């Protein structure tokens, strides 16, 4: 079943576990570093594709987050599993002036996605994601020390449609 899922869908699922997202850009500072320190560590949990061709597909992911030492940002590395199939996942998000940039896997030029902008506001991060004609956003919210919820939406015509939810 997992092998039938398109890489883009799998990366959207991985984004769900990761954490990221888009508000008005602000210079990355100590409050952003506080958010990334909160995301650092082990994350594991279930998610579900809630729209589209693979609607109803459930998955679990396990990622290790490592906060950047010198600048704001994070690297998440691990895997997601659908049934007995396991797919490696990796995301790198770094401050780039007044925004955030990065990639999942090898970026949009390969089999992954590009993170083209992002912002942290309190316990929430929003990033814009892109791959070919796909545009979307991921919103991650820290809720206490051990809980994070993530929603990934893609742009369909003029609306953002949620496609993946995780908590």
Predicted segments with their positions:
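Bacterial N-terminal signal peptides that target proteins for export
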Residues: 1-13
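Acidic, glycine-rich flexible loop segments
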Residues: 110-139
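N-terminal glycine/threonine-rich, aromatic-flanked beta-hairpin/loop signature
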Residues: 55-95
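Edge beta-strand at a domain terminus
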Residues: 26, 137-167
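C-terminal segment of classical bacterial N-terminal signal peptides
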Residues: 15-25
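Short beta-strand segments that buttress and anchor functional surface loops
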Residues: 47, 75-81, 102-107, 124-131, ...
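Amphipathic hydrophobic-ligand
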Residues: 56-62, 132-134, 160-167
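N-terminal helix-cap/turn-to-beta initiation motif at the start of protein domains
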Residues: 28-44, 69, 92, 141-143
């Amino acid at each position: 079943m997992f092998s039938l899922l398109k890489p883009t869908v799998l990366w959207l699922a991985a984004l769900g576990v990761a954490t990221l997202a888009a508000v008005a850009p602000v210079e990355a500072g100590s409050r952003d570093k506080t958010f990334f320190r909160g995301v650092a560590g082990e994350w594991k949990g279930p998610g579900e594709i809630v729209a589209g061709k693979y609607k109803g597909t459930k998955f679990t992911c396990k990622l290790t987050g490592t906060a950047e030492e010198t600048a704001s940002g994070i690297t998440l590395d691990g895997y997601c599993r659908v049934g007995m199939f396991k797919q490696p996942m990796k995301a790198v998000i770094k401050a780039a002036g007044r925004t955030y940039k990065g990639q999942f896997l090898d970026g949009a030029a390969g089999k992954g996605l590009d993170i083209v902008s992002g912002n942290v506001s309190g316990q929430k991060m929003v990033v814009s994601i892109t791959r070919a004609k796909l545009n979307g956003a991921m919103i991650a919210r820290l809720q206490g020390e051990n809980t994070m919820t993530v929603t990934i939406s893609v742009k369909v015509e003029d609306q953002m449609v949620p496609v993946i939810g995780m908590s």
